[in-house]
Amino acid sequence: MALTDGGWCLPKRFGAAAADAGDSGPFPAREPSSPLSPISSSSSSCSRGGDRGPCGASNCRTPQLDAEAVAGPPGRSLLLSPYASHPFAAAHGAAAPGVAGPGSALSTWEDLLLFTDLDQAATASKLLWSSRGAKLSPFAAEQPEEMYQTLAALSSQGPAAYDGAPGGFVHSAAAAAAAAAAASSPVYVPTTRVGSMLSGLPYLQGAGSGPSNHAGGAGAHPGWSQASADSPPYGGGGAAGGGAAGPGGAGSATAHASARFPYSPSPPMANGAARDPGGYVAAGGTGAGSVSGGGGSLAAMGGREHQYSSLSAARPLNGTYHHHHHHHPTYSPYMAAPLTPAWPAGPFETPVLHSLQGRAGAPLPVPRGPSTDLLEDLSESRECVNCGSIQTPLWRRDGTGHYLCNACGLYSKMNGLSRPLIKPQKRVPSSRRLGLSCANCHTTTTTLWRRNAEGEPVCNACGLYMKLHGVPRPLAMKKEGIQTRKRKPKNINKSKACSGNSSGSVPMTPTSSSSNSDDCTKNTSPSTQATTSGVGASVMSAVGENANPENSDLKYSGQDGLYIGVSLSSPAEVTSSVRQDSWCALALA
């Protein structure tokens, strides 16, 4: 494989005697002039897809580099304390220089493959840890910050800073390749869930078999997400192992996911191409590097490019990222129909949104309720079973449950019979009946038609005269017009007379007739009559006490409001007036 002038592919093998065992830091001593600078391009690769030369796969080492790797500079010892206690490292790895732990007594150790390509030196480098025999190393309790000192440049490119976070982890070579997605990708997929849902994600379909291809009996980690090609603006390149032939290159190995952001980024774009606002192409690894037990390199990661567009449609959703929990392998999705037709179906999509989007153009159903039932009843075409009416202010039911209009239902309820369908003809006014004439005076105009003893129709005047006098009405009394009485309103004058007596002094003379007194007494209320009787009695007692004829003015205060004062001319007039009034008979008795 031809490398660029500025690029290099230099694996370092550190033996047990390569460095001093007393080094305590992860990188205790660094050579300032050494070309092993961790700064490398995120999209660097030792091998492109298909360009597998003598340096591809496991042939990337040269004899000169092997000699240098065997010797090893004394100041480059590594302290891999997080991996010293790995059970698989104890079984397959040798004692690392400066490592105290179960794996310190072994004969061989891991290879550190450093890849860089200086054609894209602006992006940050990533370290790819490849384990020749160790598989699926667990999460490190604490990752040294010096390994990721160059990732500080990534913090300015994405929403989250991944540099120097304690609790970050790098598995082994395959795990690093799995976590080597872009650090600032807008959508995050949990690494603990990727393995179980690779079959559902179209842009990660090819990587589903990757972690399971490791030989050596470690078992595939369900949460490995496979590396893919990356673009420089998103600060990460797809990582392939030593000699991996992924389409995006393999030099961007160790994307550091901190404990604050335990999600591996979604597949980014390939080979630094400009991102399309509508979407980007993700090159997912198909092989994911089947690591052999004796070899120390990853197999070729084939590039299957899956294009999914309109990712920007998911970005304005208030920055919400769809997370899949580790405990549920497949759970009912809460996102529905694809935001755009080109969006591939995934496990986080639900039929609920499909149904909502499908009914976007359809009118919303009217909620059911009493008012809805009433509207439905009114909208239905009902018909009265009796008269056939379809409109009525109130629908009623008969005993059998059939609908009746308000008139028929009420008639049936009141009379117990069905309402007759034939309406009776309106009665013609008696004064306008054709062919009718009085059998006595032969008039055709009257206010009321009567019948005589023989049953013949007579006018109101002839019928009333016959009823009162028992003889037919004489024709001489016939008049052309109908004479009506001009009736005055009842109780108007009489009420005025009674009120006048109560408001002022009224001279009571003997000429007053008893009929007027009777009428006034009849028209007044019983309380007024009782009051009047009391007044008469008090007046008589006053007259009996005062025998003086000159004292004709009597004033009393017992009945206020009825008579203020009564002026009498003489006792004789009073006596005669009282005797003539019938209402005073009880008082005199």
UniProtKB/Swiss-Prot annotation:
PROSITE patterns linked: GATA_ZN_FINGER_1, GATA_ZN_FINGER_2
Biased composition regions of type Low complexity, renumbered to the chain: 17-47
Pfam family, one: GATA
Biased composition range(s): Basic residues: 484-493
Organs and tissues of expression: Expressed in myocardium, vascular smooth muscle, gut epithelium, and osteoclasts.
Alphabetical UniProt keywords: Activator, DNA-binding, Isopeptide bond, Metal-binding, Nucleus, Phosphoprotein, Repeat, Transcription, Transcription regulation, Ubl conjugation, Zinc, Zinc-finger
An example Gene Ontology CC term for this record: transcription regulator complex
Location of region: Disordered: 17-62, 209-274, 479-534
Compositional bias per record (Gly residues), positions renumbered to this chain: 234-251
A molecular function GO annotation: transcription coactivator binding
Primary location class: nucleus
Polar residues bias: start-end ranges: 494-534
Covalent cross-link (Glycyl lysine isopeptide (Lys-Gly) (interchain with G-Cter in SUMO2)), residues: 423, 467, 478
Zinc fingers (GATA-type) by residue: 384-408, 438-462
Cited SMART domains: ZnF_GATA
Protein location: Nucleus
Free-text note regarding domains: The GATA-type zinc fingers mediate interaction with LMCD1.
Function: Transcriptional activator that regulates SEMA3C and PLXNA2. May regulate genes that protect epithelial cells from bacterial infection. Involved in gene regulation specifically in the gastric epithelium. Involved in bone morphogenetic protein (BMP)-mediated cardiac-specific gene expression. Binds to BMP response element (BMPRE) DNA sequences within cardiac activating regions.
Subunit organization: Interacts with LMCD1.
Family matches, as PANTHER family: TRANSCRIPTION FACTOR GATA FAMILY MEMBER (PTHR10071), TRANSCRIPTION FACTOR GATA-6 (PTHR10071:SF23)
Entry protein name: Transcription factor GATA-6
UniProt lineage: Eukaryota, Metazoa, Chordata, Craniata, Vertebrata
